[in-house]
């Protein structure tokens, strides 16, 4: 009994462990939530096998009906609990959490009445009882109907027998021991427990087969593990089964009547089965065998349960670490916790901002995406439209002609356009502010400590957001100051350079016009001198000057100028040819192959005609073209360089220059201008015409190209004194100013993000913790205590995990002790010797055992014929078998322990062979 009590404690521990592993509340009673199957005992057997009698013997009271009228017709489940304070005769029935003391007879008759009602029904609902006694082991007994009854089907059997830890009792009467191989109960047990690790064989009604030597021989063979092959791995126990009824009938007022009956049962069995192992006889042996099988099942389950408990313990400890310690109830402790939480929040904030965990990348994305796009989308074209420029200049200069003093108007235009940059700068600040606010919220959510105190978490987020608002205002002031700085001071050198470039352009135009006039006069003088010189081979000298001028010279007839350019494309839109390109490094000329695409408006060149990839490409839309004198190009070259690097430049007007309309931009690579020289005048004129056509078609500017025509002295003076076009001059100046504004906007696009980072991002990194500390320190103790109030859900979770942790430690310790004991017992049993053979005492030979099982195979023996093939018949049993000792007329027919001599055991060394 002590072994069963110990296993009961172990079963409770394993039930609690299963509840913990299933994450159930340890406060709730796990017995009702998760019933264990370690202590379940299911009785299997045919009608009349003595199942109820065996279970009555385990209970210690005849509560289950037996006999013909007490046949089990529905599953009866009795949940036993042992209470040592009760007397051996007391039985406490528990119904709906209420306890009531009942007698075994009243309980038995109540069950018999319930079973007899509706006997014709096929399906029966199970009957559940909860009993407390001082004699019963803490087991859950399941008394199933006879397996040969119609109401028993596979589903009913599986409902109780399929549990992995339920102990299966295969109960057969002694008279049928020789037919054990054909027992249905044994077949069902083998089906659900092939390895027989939770099966116990019970041979009942030994006293009724005391005179049948063959049956007793078969019983002794089974008890000695020498029965059929399918029975050798099952532990067998022999019982009489009616010791409880006998004790009840003979009991007086003594408390030890049950113990006396169990000892008498063991002595009677020893006298009947003299050759059987004495450790397998009687109710005490049955309890010990049950304890052994239950311990074996628990031994198999203990390692996995312990492993699960260890994993669960680690999870609980991690959860407790995440939830933190319990709050200290003091003003200083509360304030210290608040400041520590501020430090944790600041660490998470910095990690999200600079570590890449949060939305810190969105700050850089704003600088590289939205802000530059807003700067590019400013309406510069509308503000630098010529009509708008005229209006601004007139409003700024009053009624004075704007060509006399346009600087004031242009300064005003610069201020107006740069004012537009303030809105994108402010939007950039707002966008970064939103990103920082999101980072604050994400950091607060990622701080474990703040999750325990939602009010304080909201306070920290509010303080951090207020600090970010201050940083935002400072950043807006800074970026607006950057724009105002550019608006307030426009460098005077810019306007000085404007005037200088304008005067330089006028000077070049006048020089070009002067050279054209001088060339015309030289040509006239040359014609006059040739006309007056003698002509030996020509016609008669004389004639007018006009005739001499109109008549072409023979040299011109012999060498007509032909263009060397090539055209290609469906519409002749591609023009290619050689040009001399002036090198900025060597100050010399290099012959290059140039290709003009009129559709794309681009001019590219290669070193050789065979090359496929351009060495440089010029976008003509942004360029201007003008013709320059060769003297200006060649004035820095020595005569030796001219002979070595350049072609003969005696031909007039072969050089022209391509520049960008915006002075600050380059034309090709890092060059502000591209100086080219044609190989002939025809090539130059064709190149210039086509380049002018492309530039004009794409809205570019064409510089002044000198016309090669003879002008008189008067016409030259008239051209020099011609007034400058005011609109053209203003257009040119507005383009120069636009270039300056674009340069300033590009500078702002680079500097505004720096100001934003300084005033918002870096300020948040450096001053966020100080802002939190100063704000929290300014709050009173009462306010701090109201904020540091732990969430009740978190508090309950911590308490629950603390209870689980304590229970886990307790269960792990208890189960580890049992596991170590089981391991020690297993090693001891492995080292111990096998049980000795049954003692020899003369008498029958081993052939009696073999004949017993052979006769079972050939047919029933004579000694068993009076009971039929089904064993002992309940129909002819006396009322004493039902345990009703007080019934009328049953006193004389009471069955007592027979006083017979048992058959002699087989001789020493004999064994049954199959």
Curated annotation (Swiss-Prot):
It is found in: Cytoplasm, Cytosol; Golgi apparatus membrane; Cytoplasm, Cytoskeleton, Phragmoplast; Cytoplasmic vesicle, Clathrin-coated vesicle. CDD domains: DLP_1. Residues 238-241 are annotated as: G5 motif. Residues 507-570, 629-648, 821-914 are annotated as: Disordered. Residues 572-696 form the PH domain. Residues 71-73 are annotated as: G2 motif. Residues 507-522, 547-560, 634-645 have a biased composition (Basic and acidic residues). Residues 204-207 are annotated as: G4 motif. It is a peripheral membrane protein. Increased GTPase activity in the presence of phosphatidic acid. GO terms for biological process: Golgi to vacuole transport. It is an enzyme of class 3 (hydrolase). Residues 523-535, 826-839, 852-866 have a biased composition (Polar residues). GTP binds at residues 45-52, 143-147, 204-207. GO terms for cellular component: clathrin-coated vesicle; cytosol; extracellular region; Golgi apparatus; Golgi membrane; microtubule; phragmoplast; plant-type vacuole. One of its GO terms (molecular function) is GTP binding. Residues 730-823 form the GED domain. The keyword Acetylation applies. The PH domain binds phospholipids. The PRD1 motif (721-728) is necessary for the interaction with SH3P3. Belongs to the TRAFAC class dynamin-like GTPase superfamily. Dynamin/Fzo/YdjA family. Binds PtdIns3P. Interacts with SH3P3 (via SH3 domain) and (via C-terminus) with GAMMA-ADR. May homooligomerize or heterooligomerize. Microtubule-associated force-producing protein involved in clathrin-mediated vesicle trafficking from the trans-Golgi network to the central vacuole. Able to bind and hydrolyze GTP. Binds specifically to phosphatidylinositol 3-phosphate (PtdIns3P). This is Dynamin-2A.
